[in-house]
A protein has these predicted regions:
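ATP-dependent adenylation/nucleotidyltransferase module used to activate substrates
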Residues: 2-281, 286-288
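ATP/NTP-dependent adenylation/nucleotidyl-transfer catalytic domains that generate, transfer
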Residues: 2-24, 52, 266-267, 279-362
Length: 362
């Protein structure tokens, strides 16, 4: 049965039924879920649009990626989509095994691309990720200017760490990072260190003894993706971002589609098939279509995959415990790479508990 709001006769008249895969057949086997039904119509329309001759879909081996792949294979009647996976160098063996399973299940090839700079080298050269991408970026900028982690006003710090540009009539250097440190944009601004409770107080009391940076993601994924889009001239880029997952990636977009993305020598559109999916929609899709996820979920009990035991993850301690049990070699590797960040994060969390306790007692 077709879903409400989907006019089957109109679809027939508009000649959506083409080739072996048909939109009508897709909708007749669709669960009675408006989000899933509308999404399939939209996915069919985007993927089979004659405007797009070369399409790339970036897979991760995670649960969102699994649903996205299932949608794409159901809708891609002319097999226009190339499937790729970015090997960060810190991937679970269970993820690699799952990708092989997906190739066999769907009869596709998932091309693997290595990081431009391996994460171990990136962390050694630029610094380790700490707490979040934004926090890491601002701390990195301040470290580059030999910041002393001082509790001073913005008017005092800017002349001390920035340079005055006479031509532009403004300060240049780590201005935005100092504004973050001082909270000069106001308490409601997301560019304020107070968005992370007690962080400023912690850093002043415990200045980092290691370099902090957020560029590991850039060299392992972002730059690899841009290089791919540029070299192969793809005109549609499909990625598995969901609004409901939260985080910087999801809040950076307002809808499931945007035009005129740019990479060196190439322009392309971006499509996010799962953007409007809530957890319940994804669960219903899994159950209805029999989508199976990797052992990271079904055996290890992880809630996320991707870069193993990433310090940005709230549950990195749990991930470390699981990785030690199931993939001990990877456990040793991540501790060698992110060890300083893990210890600093533990120290920060303990500091927060102590400060909260002091506040309650006063």
């Amino acid at each position: 049965m077709a879903l409400p709001h989907v006019n089957v006769d109109q679809l027939r008249e508009e000649r959506y039924i083409l080739g072996e895969k048909t939109l009508i057949g897709l909708l007749e086997n669709c669960p009675k879920n408006q989000t899933i039904g509308d999404n399939l119509v939209r996915a069919w329309s985007k993927i089979n649009n004659s405007k797009y001759e070369k399409i790339v879909c970036s897979l991760s081996g995670g649960s969102d990626s699994d649903v996205m792949l299932d949608i794409c294979t159901k809708c891609d009647k002319d097999n226009k989509i190339d499937y790729v996976w970015f090997d960060t160098g810190l991937e679970y063996q269970a993820t690699k095994d799952h990708l092989k399973y997906l190739e066999e299940k769907y009869g596709i090839e998932i091309k693997s691309y290595r990081a431009i700079k391996p994460i171990p080298l990136t962390c050694k050269e630029y610094g380790q990720p700490f707490l979040s991408k934004q926090v890491s970026e601002f701390m990195n900028r301040l470290q580059k200017h030999s910041f002393k982690w001082e509790d001073e006003a913005i008017d005092v710090l800017i002349p001390r760490y920035c340079k005055w540009n006479e031509k532009k009539q403004k300060w240049i250097g780590c201005v935005s990072a100092l504004e973050w440190w001082c909270g000069s944009k106001g308490s409601s601004s997301k560019f304020n260190i107070t968005q992370n409770k007690w962080l400023k107080e912690f850093i002043i009391a415990n200045p980092p003894t290691f370099k902090v940076s957020n560029v590991c993601c850039q060299y392992a994924k972002k730059d690899v993706s841009h290089k791919l889009l540029s070299e192969f001239g793809y005109d549609l880029n499909i990625i598995g971002i969901r609004k409901a997952e939260g985080g910087a990636r999801s809040t950076a977009y307002k809808s499931c589609f945007d035009e005129n993305g740019k990479s060196k020598g190439n322009t392309y559109d971006n499509y996010r098939p799962l953007f409007w999916y809530k957890n319940s929609d994804k669960d219903e899709y899994d159950k209805h279509y029999g989508v199976l996820h990797s052992r990271c979920y079904t055996e290890y009990g992880l809630k996320r995959t991707g870069c193993c035991c990433c310090p940005y993850g709230r549950d990195f301690e749990y991930e470390l415990k699981i990785t030690k049990e199931y993939e001990p070699k990877l456990f040793i590797a991540v501790n060698n790479i992110f060890g300083d960040s893990y210890e600093y994060t533990r120290k920060y969390k303990e500091f927060c508990k102590e400060m909260d306790e002091k506040k309650r007692n006063n």
